[in-house]
Amino acid sequence: MLEILYQDPWLVAVNKPAGWLVHRSWLDRDEKVVVMQTVRDQIGQHVFTAHRLDRPTSGVLLMGLSSEAGRRLAQQFEQHHIRKRYHAIVRGWLMDDAVLDYPLVEERDKIADKFAREDKAPQPAVTQYRGLATVEMAVPTGRYPTTRYGLVELEPKTGRKHQLRRHLAHLRHPIIGDSKHGDLRQNRSAAEHFACRRLMLHASRLELTHPFTGQPLIIQAGLDETWMQALTQFGWRGLLPDNERVEFTAASRQDETHLT
């Protein structure tokens, strides 16, 4: 069962485990574990997506319990009225508190976007980021005798595909576990020495105005075991008090094989 973070007559939010698809895709026809179908079976009613999380990303996923609720939520996301907060573990020491305004060329899928235009101009992409902590571990990576990691808080102000992953790669601080935009040697080292066998990106919090009641709504998602073990090993416990926890549900024991 998935962990339900919030539910009322109009909305439901769950803590999406890493490795789970949000909805079925013809690109992954054999995938049996899908968030939308699992939530539908769990609560006994249909759900309607308003946003998405990449397969390897964990955290808050908010859905409507009717097509109208889904539409209103989607409109808020599209108009950037919903504040999103993520946390990531990255390569190196990133301690800036800054905003990156770096346009991104649309990332196309070789199959799904086979017939899409190839001459589209880069799209505006803005990310606010803040370094929270750093650590240097006595583990060699490549030609270096030690390995450095950073804990970063991220708030995307736009919603481009893989925006956070691509922006951090642009800053030369790729997210650990990112097999597409990251550092493969760092990924292997983190997996071998610190059991970070997934993309270390977590959607920690959504802050919005409820689309039906007009009341402020904050939804937060706890970290899974992989994250908590990393925080412990790096001496970062207590830095994310709203998301840290000790006990875990079965659903939080995510499939660590999906890192793409």
UniProtKB/Swiss-Prot annotation:
Catalysis: reaction(s): uridine(65) in tRNA = pseudouridine(65) in tRNA
Catalytic residues identified in the record: 54
Biological processes, Gene Ontology terms: enzyme-directed rRNA pseudouridine synthesis; tRNA processing
Entries under CDD domains matching the protein: PseudoU_synth_TruC
GO MF annotation, one: RNA binding
Pfam family, one: PseudoU_synth_2
Broad EC category: isomerase
Protein role: Responsible for synthesis of pseudouridine from uracil-65 in transfer RNAs.
Record family assignment: Belongs to the pseudouridine synthase RluA family.
Record-given protein name: tRNA pseudouridine synthase C
Organism: Salmonella typhimurium (strain LT2 / SGSC1412 / ATCC 700720)
